[in-house]
């Protein structure tokens, strides 16, 4: 249940987000494939960080898609994000996407953020009303916010993840399953079919993956490479065009899930229920810079809320 009221909780890492938001723990772990960290961060008003894919090992994690899975961390304290993240990183020879973080310190060199706005969802009105104080405080602190329309883009996520899960789950079950448990994806789905009341969430997704025609490994590899490049090029083009390092959103976008770069949700207003958050993203490997930015913006958000409360009292 969402601690803020009768609202949706988000994706499959919602349990971690709820535990953090409710104060049951200081930090929790989750895994993002396509929104499973970011969406619960939005819905439950917590800091949810998806590192660059490959910086944190996926070994032992129940897989959905080895092409896109990325472990991350959720907290109520932005400073704790960095502490937990640095304790998780390390090269894992068993993870074919694993690589080493080059630098342990990085501060943003430019105070410019590109904010992608989906006007059809009323996001511009939200910026002009409930987030007006936050934007004003950003400017007072030297930040330049450039508003652009959210580009429309789609990826072959369903095809890739549905192909991945059949092989990935089978491999996982062979390694970690016991003798009395299914040893293949097909066996797992059949087991779930026998107990439909116990598996209400995600069953349709598993059935779709089972029914989807399989593609060759070489074709899958090419498709993954094309989609990752498409996402990274989109991000790079926007940041390069506006000479910026960070791009923000008022709702989840899957560019960083697909491209692999870091992203993080940042609660900016608790005056409404559920809280209002933004999502920030950066280029691959720019993890510590985005964590530094999130920490700085969290202080600005607190100042904006304080100013807004004073204004409400004066009225």
Language-model segments: what does each one mean?
Residues 1-85, 261-269, 274-279:
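Short glycine/serine-rich loop segments
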Residues 17-19, 137, 254-258:
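Hydrophobic/aromatic ligand-binding patch that stacks against planar heteroaromatic rings
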Residues 25, 82, 207-315:
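Glycine-rich, small-residue loops and helix-cap segments
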Residues 28-31, 57-58, 82, 92-98, ...:
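Acidic/polar loop patches that form or flank catalytic/metal-binding clefts of enzymes
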Residues 29-33, 52, 116-119, 150, ...:
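Active-site-proximal beta-strand/loop segments in catalytic clefts of secreted hydrolases
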Residues 47-134, 303-315:
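A short helix-breaking turn/cap at a secondary-structure junction
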Residues 76-99, 112, 121-152, 159, ...:
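Acidic-enriched catalytic cores of C-N bond-cleaving enzymes acting on peptides and small amides
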Residues 110, 163-230, 267-277:
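Short helix-loop capping/hinge segments that flank enzyme active sites or metal/cofactor-binding pockets
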